[in-house]
């Protein structure tokens, strides 16, 4: 199992790396060149940089990820593309995307978009908290434990 991270704007990269080091798992962070970093990372962490542009990281993840891998993303659309490949998908708030819940999530996203296009307002995400990070870490550890 490799852990892939949809890295653009992900608040849990460091948490994923911490857990992956403990469990001796490889991490692949896919992000745009805008987020290039010279920071030193553990040996098991690699970066794949993609051009700027909507969905460039998503398309690269779909290309690279394999059955049995784990993806960390908040992107419902990306989750829906990799679930049929047998990939486990975890949201940064700690809930797992599944074949059973993805259609409802996509439908909710669609209707929210319709409201916004008509000039309406929908609730945006709340700021990411330390409690969110703790919840995510526990969910990640549990999912990895069940999958190995």
Curated annotation (Swiss-Prot):
A Pfam match: DUF188
Superkingdom as given in the UniProt entry: Bacteria
InterPro entries: UPF0178
S-S pairs: none
Similarity field: Belongs to the UPF0178 family.
UniProt cross-references to PANTHER family, sorted A to Z: UPF0178 PROTEIN YAII
Protein's name according to its UniProt entry: UPF0178 protein EF_0842
């Amino acid at each position: 199992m490799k852990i892939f991270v949809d890295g653009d704007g992900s608040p849990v990269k460091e948490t994923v790396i911490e857990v992956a080091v403990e469990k001796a798992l490889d991490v692949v962070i896919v992000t745009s060149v805008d987020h290039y970093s010279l920071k030193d990372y553990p040996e098991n962490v690699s970066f794949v940089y993609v051009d700027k542009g909507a969905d460039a990281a998503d398309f690269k993840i779909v290309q690279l990820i394999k059955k049995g891998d784990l993806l960390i993303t908040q992107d419902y659309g990306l989750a829906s593309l990799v679930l049929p490949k047998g990939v486990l998908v975890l949201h940064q708030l700690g809930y797992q995307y599944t074949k059973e819940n993805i259609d409802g999530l996509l439908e909710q996203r669609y209707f929210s978009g319709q409201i916004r296009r008509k000039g309406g307002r929908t609730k945006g995400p709340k700021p990411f908290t330390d409690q969110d990070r703790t919840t995510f870490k526990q969910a990640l550890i549990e999912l990895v434990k069940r999958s190995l």
